[in-house]
Amino acid sequence: MTTFNLTIVSAENKIFEGAVKSVQATGIEGELGILAGHTPLLTAIKPGIVKFTYNDGIEEVIYVSGGFLEIQPNIVTVLADVAIRGSDLDQDRILAAKKKAEDNIVAKSGDLNHEMLTAKLSKELAKLRAYELTEKLVKNKR
């Protein structure tokens, strides 16, 4: 299968750059599956995971806090405020932050910041999904 170049950068550094055969991400209008030769596109992406597959079939997961995805026929670029490899996520920290976000939503249900609190919970759930998917991929390699 034909490969293309994928670059994932955060505000702090370049997280990944290399040849891949496919990329999956969540755009603002739904799921995106990207292969070499994809039609050019620029779209915002939601907080969640970017999953990509190397030419040998190995998959990797990166959590992104949202950002932009640019697709050219042989180059895909993800620009995110925060990007963390699934293998670098800490389950205990994620679960603690998720619990705190849930408690804040319950405690401040009538608060004007409810939308912001819900967005925080959504990000923690996306991190947890990235962590769990990475764990599953690691177990399948064994």
UniProtKB/Swiss-Prot annotation:
The protein's UniProt keywords, in alphabetical order, are: ATP synthesis, Cell inner membrane, Cell membrane, CF(1), Hydrogen ion transport, Ion transport, Membrane, Transport
Q: Where in the cell is it found?
A: Cell inner membrane
Domain of life of the source:
Bacteria
Where does it mainly reside?
A: membrane
Q: Name one GO molecular function term.
A: ATP binding
GO cellular component terms attached to this protein's record = plasma membrane; proton-transporting ATP synthase complex
Q: Which residues form a coiled coil?
A: none
What topology does it adopt in the membrane? Answer: Peripheral membrane protein
Say yes or no: keyword Transport present. yes
Quaternary arrangement and interactors, per the entry? Answer: F-type ATPases have 2 components, CF(1) - the catalytic core - and CF(0) - the membrane proton channel. CF(1) has five subunits: alpha(3), beta(3), gamma(1), delta(1), epsilon(1). CF(0) has three main subunits: a, b and c.
Hey, which family's this protein in?
Belongs to the ATPase epsilon chain family.
Q: What does this protein do?
A: Produces ATP from ADP in the presence of a proton gradient across the membrane.
This one is known as ATP synthase epsilon chain
Organism phylogeny? Bacteria, Pseudomonadati, Pseudomonadota, Gammaproteobacteria, Pasteurellales
- Name of the encoding gene: atpC
